[in-house]
């Protein structure tokens, strides 16, 4: 990736707050997430982080961004605080929620959070094995906080998910795209 001048972008929507992410050590140029997963916040914010290399690419851009909504060059000026640049009204209640969620993670301890996610994953895996259900993703690529289960032939995933919700108050999302 790097030898071709490309930026290394990482999707952390599911994992931020549940895994030990080492942006600098792993030479990640940009990562993005959502607050509604491992950060345990209401949905509505998208935490992002950029390396110096990514910020330089943004500032060196020679063409105008065609869309106001994701004009990162304008947003980075907003972040700097050097000049007033109106981009959006900050959702202050969401920021308070994110602050509290980060405080909760620090209070529990990052290693404890990571271990908790792994323990729950292993417990789920043990129970799935007893039911003869298999996880879709190979062990070496799995995230402990994201478990995709292969629905056995002849079973209807919607019926299974509806029953889990109705009888056990467990809500499970369906697959997306060809995996739906």
Model-based region annotation:
Residues 8-12, 31-34, 41, 172-174:
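General beta-strand structural signal in soluble alpha/beta enzymes
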Residues 24-25, 49-50, 163-167:
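Short, solvent-exposed amphipathic alpha-helical segments in soluble enzyme
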Residues 30, 45-49, 146-148:
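Conserved hydrophobic/aromatic beta-strand scaffold that supports enzyme active sites
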Residues 36-125:
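Active-site C-terminal subdomain of aminotransferase-like
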């Amino acid at each position: 990736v790097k030898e071709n001048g490309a930026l290394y972008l990482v999707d952390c929507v599911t994992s931020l707050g549940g895994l030990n992410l080492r942006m600098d050590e792993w030479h990640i140029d940009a990562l993005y997430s959502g607050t509604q997963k491992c950060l345990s916040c209401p949905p509505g914010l998208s935490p992002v982080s950029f390396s110096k290399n990514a910020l330089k690419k943004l500032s060196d851009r020679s063409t105008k961004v065609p869309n106001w909504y994701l004009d990162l060059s304008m947003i980075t000026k907003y972040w700097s605080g050097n000049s007033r640049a109106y981009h959006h009204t900050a959702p202050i209640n969401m920021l308070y929620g994110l602050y509290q969620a980060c405080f909760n993670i620090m209070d529990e301890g990052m290693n404890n959070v990571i271990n908790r996610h792994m323990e729950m994953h292993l417990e789920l895996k043990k129970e799935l094995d007893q039911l003869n259900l298999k996880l879709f993703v190979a062990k070496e690529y799995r995230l402990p906080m994201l478990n995709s289960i292969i629905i056995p032939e002849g079973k209807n995933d919607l019926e299974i998910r509806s029953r889990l919700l109705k009888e056990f108050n467990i809500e499970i999302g369906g697959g997306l795209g060809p995996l739906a």
